[in-house]
Regions:
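Extracellular "leader-to-stem" segments immediately downstream of a signal peptide or signal-anchor
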Residues: 3-18, 25-233, 253, 298-300, ...
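Transmembrane beta-strand segments that form the barrel wall of outer-membrane beta-barrel proteins
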Residues: 75, 258-260, 581
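Feature marks extracellular polysaccharide-active and adherence modules
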Residues: 110, 117, 148, 154-156, ...
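Short glycine/acidic-rich loop motifs that flank beta-strands on beta-rich extracellular proteins
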Residues: 118-119, 163-166, 176, 229-236, ...
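Small-residue (G/S/T/A) turn/hinge positions that recur once per unit in extracellular repeat modules
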Residues: 218, 247, 292, 338, ...
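Asp-box/WD-like beta-propeller blade repeats and closely related beta-sheet repeat scaffolds
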Residues: 239, 659-662
Length: 960
């Protein structure tokens, strides 16, 4: 319970740089603040103890949030020392173990240099392949630190970009592992692919040594890692610095890897997230293997400069480091990853900047979307060994070669799809692939030697691309199949050196084919990360369930929690911190303005890793699903690092087929509310940002399985951000150790037929970035605002993924001013029972609907469509433009214009159509009331096949 006992206190508050900023009187309240190791019991009540509220941990360097931790490695019970010669392995592991036993939390490392001089031994049990049989065998590896689920390491980090490259603050010195024979070890093994009906695969399982082993639901943030004994003139291999083993969610944020040999390895697992980090890696920076749910790389810089400019003893010259990495290193290496999201990745000075290809041992390759990826000064800026049929989307990026290098190289195994939109190439693009389509839209080519494009095989599309030289544009090798170009070249004149034996070459120019190019410089993140103005923290000791058991909390703490929140508000704002455990909140609470409700998580997380959770049976009472939300955020209030679970969603007369209807779990009630690193283990509805004007709202990494509604936005909000939403039914069925009282529900079928994941109504200047939903009727949905009566305005959607949906993108309502621009969309349908019609895009709910204005616009730049559509895209009204798309599967009709208009440019229709087809089957259909379809500069694997039943017009460069 929270003890309300106000008193007057004179304080001198220090800012994060330890400068005195103000002296003031404050009215504060006291609360029980105790540190209790998590025991396998249900904490049914709490004692009352008056104690002075605390400030957050004082850091030397700026932080995006306030630093909060119950476990400080230098505390006497752990004994870490920032002293030369002291081995910190035991002390750090003790703090990590304590945090784990307490249910999870942050282990804090104050600024200083901490040495590590010894290892521990781990065991990996592997299904070893022996011919066509298998056996289970243990392999040993060495590691220094093991992060258990729910535990995060956090230090005090100085951004090198703000300190002339200097590495300052918390530095982990690795003085063990030099010249390890098992620095990157693996063993041939068997593996069942859960994404392919458990098909048996041959692969290689890593048994490599590692410095920090990251298990499910772990994080490494705000620190630097340095190898003092590495010598650029005598480079020795070291084990992986950071190694994600398996399971969901490993996060690396605000980390500098000064001179790793190998940086971060994501072994077969899911949901890695590397962001806002820097590294010099001498061999490999980031390597990804068999990631079967969205991995994210965001704002990461990989370059020789971070070691050279570190200011640390023995730092070599930039020239010496670059000479080594340019001869030996790979910045980012992606093997099979399903839907990897890569944005704002910067790589320079490597042999290979970005490598994309197969898993060792079998042919599975990735699909991915890359946005604002910039590679320069590399032997191969981008090396493409192979890609799965769904393709790679690359937008608003640049690839540059060093001397005698290639901006892009396609290896002989490539035979699918890579799409470049708004990409600048400095150096040659060379293609030795075996087929497929490489397409370029609104791209530039410069600084090449003989030819900008040297394509020896396959098919190439060029649309509105600029070549900076008046010669040497395209070389076609003997086995080239197709080159199609519209309005491309030097001043729109394309020069082709054709050495093919039978290539189809089509070069067209004309003003009638001009189109609006992909938008540039789109803002995707907020300028200042939200947090309370005050750094004061009240740690509430409320009744909760704890331990690795299946206990649920029994006491409703709603009133105590509200009292604590109000107390923080009364004292001028700050953070109410709930340590790890399961809390029962059966009545609505309101987070006051200027207050943050915070749990044990500094990073994104999955249900399976425990931590702080709010359990509830609240269902809206007499008002039902129209009742108040469980957690209500006033203006400038937030919630961070917590999991929510609706306990009674499928009980007491309800089931997974008919789950309980409840209000939204979270509702924003004013401007600048924020929801960060929140997970919904299961709930009926997620976040309501539509009932009030929540201008400036910020949602980053909502994960989970809401059943009927994910995030709904409207109410006239302006300047909001919805980022990194990750909705997948497995959040409801993958439980933490011991179950920990979470309901185990398998909701795939229900959400596919009932959920509307993302809704946008009356919003302006909305940022919608790198979101993903698996299973929904409508993956992303645009409609008229139920409160203001207004329509969606102009907005840009970047990196949206809808998988397993009935309609992956649905525009239900739009007026003449509606303009929705989508970049790097991946839209997928799957066969869903009782859903007879499925399509990637639905514009309007019926033919010539008056809910969609004829001038309303939907423009999709650089898209990938696959799965099991009945019809690829259904246009009932308005104008839909496909500016580069891979229709891996197009259904009966790829683009079905029943009303309104469509434009299709630079697209690949990869589904083969037999010479004798069913009625109406084709890549396009213009219905009796459809106005027009333009087809310009596309590739059709079975030739241009279309159907027309009215007076509308089919035109474009492909219509002969």
């Amino acid at each position: 319970m929270v003890s309300l006992n106000p008193f007057l206190e004179q304080s001198i508050i220090m800012n994060r740089n330890n400068e005195t900023t103000e002296t003031f009187s404050k009215l504060w309240v006291t609360a029980m603040i105790t540190l209790t190791m998590m025991l396998p019991v249900n904490v049914a009540c709490s004692q009352t103890k008056q104690q002075v509220p605390q400030q957050s941990i004082k850091t030397i360097y700026p932080t995006k949030d306030w630093a909060i931790s119950d476990f400080v490695v230098t505390a006497p019970e752990f004994g870490a020392k920032a002293e030369p010669g002291f081995d910190n392995r035991v002390a750090f592991q003790a703090a990590i173990d304590a945090a784990y036993q307490s249910g999870g939390g942050v282990v804090y490392i104050p600024a200083g240099n901490y040495e590590f001089r010894s290892t521990q031994v781990g065991t990996k049990n592997v299904r070893v392949r022996q011919g066509r049989s298998e056996t289970k065998k243990d392999f040993h590896f060495e590691y220094v630190l093991r992060l258990h689920p729910g535990v995060q390491l956090r230090g005090d980090w100085a951004d090198p970009a703000s300190h002339n490259g200097k590495v300052l603050g918390t530095i982990l010195e690795v003085r063990v592992g030099k010249d390890s024979p098992n620095y990157d070890g693996s063993v041939e093994s068997w593996w069942n692919d859960g994404q392919a009906d458990n098909a048996l695969r041959t692969t290689y399982t890593s048994i490599a040594d590692r410095f920090i082993e990251m298990n499910a639901g772990t994080g490494v943030t705000n620190l630097s890692i340095w190898y003092p004994e590495q010598d650029i003139h005598h480079v020795k291999p070291y084990p992986w610095t950071l190694f994600q083993t398996q399971g969901d969610c490993a996060t690396i944020e605000r980390v500098t890897l000064v001179n790793s040999y190998n940086g971060f390895n994501s072994a077969p697992s899911e949901l890695h997230y590397v962001l806002n980090s820097y590294m010099t890696a001498l061999n490999k920076g980031i390597e990804v293997h068999v990631c079967t749910d969205i991995g994210r790389i965001e704002n990461v810089r990989i370059s020789p400069e971070y070691w050279a400019n570190s200011g640390l003893p023995g730092a070599p010259s930039l020239e010496d480091v670059t000479a080594y990495t340019r001869a030996n290193g790979t910045g980012y290496q992606m093997h099979r990853s399903d839907w990897e999201y890569v944005s704002y990745l910067y790589i320079s000075g490597y042999k290979t900047g970005v490598w994309i290809g197969r898993e060792p041992g079998f042919a599975d390759a990735p699909n991915a979307q890359l946005y604002e990826v910039h590679v320069g000064g590399c032997g191969n800026g981008l090396y493409v060994e192979d890609v799965n049929p769904y393709g790679i989307l690359i937008s608003n990026s640049s690839f540059g070669a060093g001397q005698d290098g290639n901006a892009v190289y396609f290896y002989k195994d490539f035979s699918t799809s890579v799409q470049f939109n708004g990409v600048d190439f400095k150096g040659s693009v060379v293609g030795d692939g075996d087929g497929g389509v490489v397409s370029f839209e609104s791209c530039t080519f410069s600084e090449y030697n003989d030819y900008a494009l040297r394509m020896n095989r396959g098919n190439v599309l060029l649309s509105q691309c600029e070549f900076k030289k008046n010669a040497g544009h395209v070389y076609l090798g003997a086995n080239m199949h197709t080159l199609k170009s519209v309005n491309s070249g030097y001043k729109s004149k394309l020069k082709v050196d054709n050495h093919s034996t039978s290539a189809k070459v089509e070069v067209i120019t004309g003003k009638k084919y001009f189109f609006e190019p992909i938008p540039k410089n789109v803002k995707t993140n907020i300028d200042v990360h939200p947090r309370p103005v005050s750094d004061r923290v009240l740690k509430a000791d409320l009744a909760r369930a704890t331990g690795f058991n299946n206990d649920r909390p029994v006491k409703d703490v709603s009133a105590d929690l509200q009292s604590a929140l109000d107390a923080v508000k009364a004292a001028g704002g700050g953070t109410l911190y709930l340590p790890a455990g399961r809390y029962l909140v059966n009545n609505p609470i309101k987070v006051p303005s200027g207050v943050e409700l915070r749990g044990s998580w500094d990073v994104q997380h999955h249900t399976q890793s425990g931590g702080t959770a709010i359990f509830t049976n609240y269902d809206g009472g007499n008002a039902g699903e129209s009742g108040p939300s469980l957690i209500q955020l006033e203006a400038h209030a937030g919630i961070r690092g917590i999991t929510l679970a609706q306990l009674n969603i499928a009980s007491d007369g309800f089931s997974v087929e008919n789950p309980r209807k409840t209000p939204f779990l979270i509702q924003g009630q004013g401007p600048k509310v924020y929801i960060i690193n929140v997970t919904i283990a299961v709930g009926d509805k997620g976040i309501d940002l539509a009932s009030y004007d929540t201008s400036g709202h910020y949602v980053d990494y909502l994960g989970g399985v809401p059943l009927r509604a994910g995030i709904w936005v409207g109410g006239g909000a302006e300047g909001g951000f919805i980022r990194n939403m990750q909705l997948n039914p497995h959040y409801g069925s993958r439980l933490p150790e011991g179950g920990q009282g979470y309901p185990e529900v398998f909701m795939m079928r229900f959400v596919q037929s009932n959920c509307s994941a993302l809704k946008f109504a009356d919003v302006k200047n909305q940022t919608i970035f790198n979101n993903f939903v698996y299973g929904s009727v409508y993956g992303i949905h645009f409609l008229k605002d139920a409160i203001t009566g207004k329509y969606p305005g102009e907005m840009t959607v970047i990196g949206h993924g809808s998988d397993g949906c009935t309609y992956s993108l649905f525009v239900e309502d739009a007026d003449k001013d509606t303009k929705i621009v989508a970049i790097n969309s991946e839209l997928v349908n799957t066969k869903i029972p009782n859903e007879p019609v499925r399509s990637y895009v639905l514009m309007g709910d019926k033919v010539n609907t008056d809910k969609v204005h004829p001038d309303a616009k939907l423009i999709l730049y650089n898209s990938a469509f696959w799965g099991s559509p009945v019809i690829g895209a259904i246009i009932n009204n308005g104008i839909v433009s496909f500016q580069q798309a891979n229709f891996s599967r197009s259904g009966t009709q790829g683009v079905d214009v029943r009303g309104g208009k469509a434009h299709v440019y630079t697209s690949y229709f990869a589904q083969k159509i037999a010479e004798t087809t069913v009625k109406d089957e084709g890549y396009a259909r213009l219905g009796a009331q459809g106005k027009s379809i333009e087809f310009t500069n596309n590739y059709y694997i079975s030739g241009f096949r279309f159907n027309k039943s009215g007076e509308g017009l089919i035109y474009g460069s492909d219509k002969k």
